[in-house]
């Protein structure tokens, strides 16, 4: 991809408040790598307008000399001239359209790529508070709006503006008195365009928001279609989508109403100027000073001006739509990326891990609502302290919401601790570069994420350079081969979106195979065997025991039967450690762990 300009040092709110001209200049800066194509497009547009103006400039000689027979050569060469002129005009039109489309598509492709990369570089807190549908809408709908609106707008604005300037030049050349009358309406038209432009920007912003709502609603419903069918929620979802769809339609009709009203208003105002010219020509002094050809030319030029004025008014709405889309895109690009202030490299950790008086509150992630922030929010983690030696297994247990998964999120620096520090090999994890830190961990969560790709590529996602033998070995260890061998293409079988063609247990085994292949010093298992049947779980537990040898493991468990052999077990309640020890010592205490154990094995 071509190099993109540096993101302006604006906050997202500053970007939203930037003027149309500021946003346009910023957008044009993305076209710098394609400036030759842009220059060619401008030349084509100006050439197209020049041919049209030259045609009209021959109207006076045609009336005064050609039709009267005063210049026979004029009429003789006119047919050939028309053919040549239209050929040149067609070539100019092609150059303008093709080159502008080439520049526009490249700019939008770069912008879309940069937007995608920026969104993927945003902190987890940003994704927590932003709907996936709205982000997808920005990447698809908003960027397409920039392409369709701005590219078409530039073509019309440059071409028609050059045409208008050419016509005005001809009008003043033949009769400055009559032409001056037409210019008197310019301030009025400028005021109307300014008012209408503000309306266009406001409605365009609303349309983009409405499209984000449509995308979000559709995505949520499609992802949860089984739940909708199970609970008979079709009519409820139909009604909800209809309401959102209606809002989108209303915003579009507001845009159409403004656009439809602005064009005839400007044309009516222009007609007053035209009528006044007809009235002025009744003056004897003015009528005697111009020839019939001049008068016909002036009237024709003024009439011809109505069409480009209409086109410029129409294209203004599209231009404002494109600028509103730019504002939406730039507001994301101006968000700060995930902070990566670490400067230490880490090739492979020895496996030592420590939490030292760690506190964490989601209040500091900016994901909370205003009402939440006004409350004295309790800590999600409160004074968490423990140490793990290389190869040890720690199990975190407790009721839902006790902070177990939050602790694992801090390890990967999806969030940073509010207080205290987390150490790997006696070094604060915030001192490591993020990429080096995260490649120390394999992570298998309750919510398995697979990609619309082959089984082999999903297993090798964390290690794309893995050999076929390594992939097969990991697949065997996680019991993936048991079902892959029955597929027509084996490990090369495409498993559909998020592994839709696999069962829950099969999807979980693929995720475990992916973790096995990465061969990292740390392993995080967040209920990694929760979706397996009894037989599969037995095989997986054997594989996990092999995997956990010589690796530091953090196991988040609800089923206590899976962590009885853990070196350390920490029982958490409301973000605090209430007990810790091994299985036997905690049972002997007859405390919180023993109570959880008795509940599960009664």
UniProtKB/Swiss-Prot annotation:
It catalyses: ATP + H2O + lipid A-core oligosaccharideSide 1 = ADP + phosphate + lipid A-core oligosaccharideSide 2. Its main location: membrane. NCBIfam families: MsbA_lipidA. It is a multi-pass membrane protein. Coiled coil: none annotated. PROSITE patterns: ABC_TM1F, ABC_TRANSPORTER_1, ABC_TRANSPORTER_2, MSBA. In MsbA the ATP-binding domain (NBD) and the transmembrane domain (TMD) are fused. This is ATP-dependent lipid A-core flippase 1. Residues 39-321 form the ABC transmembrane type-1 domain. ATP binds at residues 398-405. SMART domains: AAA. GO terms for cellular component: plasma membrane. Homodimer. The lineage of its organism: Bacteria, Pseudomonadati, Pseudomonadota, Gammaproteobacteria, Alteromonadales. Its EC number is 7.5.2.6. Keywords: ATP-binding, Cell inner membrane, Cell membrane, Lipid transport, Membrane, Nucleotide-binding, Translocase, Transmembrane, Transmembrane helix, Transport. Residues 362-599 form the ABC transporter domain. The gene is msbA1. Belongs to the ABC transporter superfamily. Lipid exporter (TC 3.A.1.106) family. PANTHER family: ATP-BINDING CASSETTE SUB-FAMILY B MEMBER 10, MITOCHONDRIAL, ATP-DEPENDENT PERMEASE MDL1, MITOCHONDRIAL. It holds the Pfam family ABC_tran. It is found in: Cell inner membrane. It comes from Colwellia psychrerythraea (strain 34H / ATCC BAA-681) (Vibrio psychroerythus). The chain crosses the membrane at residues 36-56, 80-100, 154-174, 176-196, 261-281.
